[in-house]
A protein has these predicted regions:
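Transmembrane alpha-helix boundary/anchor motif
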Residues: 24, 74-77, 122
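"…together with the soluble PPM/PP2C metallo-phosphatase catalytic core" -> "…together
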Residues: 351
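Exoplasmic/lumenal beta-rich domain surfaces
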Residues: 356-359
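Non-transmembrane, membrane-proximal soluble domains of secreted or membrane proteins
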Residues: 30-59, 79-334, 340-346, 363-379
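Alpha-helical transmembrane segments
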Residues: 66-85
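N-terminal secretory/membrane targeting signals
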Residues: 1-32
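Hydrophobic single transmembrane helices highlighted by the model
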Residues: 53-72
Length: 379
């Protein structure tokens, strides 16, 4: 009777646990419930490469869950069934131990092999699928070269050649056409970095003196967060970038803008030294490691990025002339390129069309007056 009572109680608790588990699994359909829909979510994916990797994760989870339940059930049964219930049973001599049961041992080995095969098949398929663009889609592939520096990313577009300037180059914001496979050649000029856009593809390392690559695709236009995923020095944690996927027309318009020289504005007739000075807003005090990135936008992140593509509204030619003079005076041109103005530095990120970017400082800060002032004064 006592055993029956124990088993009945165990059954009651098991039903309660299963009910809680069922509610949890159903709730998982809503990514917000588990806070799995963040900027770097690997669960709410938006591309075929990340989707194939997520499928492997799910298969592995289900297989291990089944194993966990079976092993746990046998362990629970043995613990209840053969528990010593009296002082005499606690002091009893254990029964004679045998060498084992060949049938059970062979069965367990077979079950283990089966579990590994179930995991291995989708894993191998995903490895082959994610290694390179599928043959039937290679004709539609767009190619980009990503180069890691301490601590920023450079993106070159080999198919977009600019007369006298080589391939189109940008920094920290990778703009791609949505709905097309993108092959990204991975390079580094210093240490090992790792290129990772969680919603679009798993990470792949950038290794010195070694050519590496990955491919990804954004199914729809969108704004995605990327990150270096390999410790690469003091500022590794803030080595970030963005991926912006655009529709065909928007992407072609962006290419047209980016392959053009940086605009030149006629200087004012007054001397630069007499030009009005920049009036900056009061700078807030940032805590250590606070990024300054807005968590919520009044509009979508993609629309916020698009708003940066036409930054000429309200421009002041006098201030532009003053800034250009300061750019020369402070020797910014020794590191940074501004195409069309004779500034051809190569060691730092290109600043051509800098105003069209939504971020600065390695995609750590928003590109606005306050954050730009903060960055220039204390990089």
């Amino acid at each position: 009777m006592r055993l029956a009572t124990i088993l009945s109680s165990a059954a009651h608790w098991s039903r309660a646990v299963l009910a809680v588990g069922a509610v949890s699994l159903l709730s998982a359909c809503d990514y917000n419930f588990w806070r799995m829909d963040g900027h770097q979510s690997t669960i709410k994916v938006e591309g075929p490469v990340a989707k194939s990797q997520l499928d492997v994760f799910y298969v592995t989870c289900w297989v291990t869950l089944v194993i966990f339940i079976l092993v746990g059930a046998v362990l629970a049964y043995a613990s209840i069934k053969f528990k010593a219930r009296t002082p005499e049973e606690e002091k009893a001599i254990p029964p004679e131990q045998g060498h084992g049961n060949p049938l059970i041992e062979i069965g367990l080995i077979g079950a283990s092999v089966l579990a590994l095969v179930i995991i291995a098949i989708p894993t191998l398929k995903a490895i082959w699928y994610t290694y390179d663009v599928p043959e039937d889609r290679k004709a539609d592939t767009y190619e980009v070269t990503a180069t890691g520096y301490q601590w920023w990313f450079k993106f070159d577009y080999p198919s977009e050649q600019i007369a006298g300037a080589g391939a189109l180059s940008t920094a920290n914001e990778l703009v791609i056409p949505a709905g097309r496979p993108i092959r990204i050649n991975l390079r580094t000029v210093d240490v090992i970095h790792s290129f990772w856009v969680p919603k679009l593809a798993g990470k792949v390392d950038m290794i010195p003196n070694r050519a590496n690559h990955l491919w990804l695709q954004a199914d729809q236009p969108g704004y995605y967060w990327g990150q270096c995923a390999e410790f690469c020095g003091d500022s590794h944690a803030v080595m970030r970038f963005r991926v912006i996927a655009l529709g065909p027309k928007d992407f072609n318009d962006w290419l047209t803008q980016q392959t053009s020289p940086a605009r030149d504005v006629a200087p004012p007739r007054i001397a630069t030294k007499d030009a009005p000075k920049v009036q900056f807003a009061s700078l807030r005090t940032f805590k250590q490691n606070e990024t300054g990135i807005t968590a919520k936008y009044d509009t979508s992140p993609l629309d916020a990025w698009k708003a940066h593509q036409f930054p000429e509204k309200g421009e002041n030619p006098a201030l532009i002339a003053q800034g250009k003079a300061l750019f020369k005076e402070k020797a910014c041109l020794s590191c940074h390129e501004v195409r069309g103005h004779g500034f051809a530095g190569i060691s730092g990120p290109t600043l051509t069309h800098f105003g069209s970017r939504s971020t600065l400082a390695g995609a750590l800060l928003e590109n606005n007056t306050e954050q730009l002032h903060r960055w220039i004064h204390n990089p």
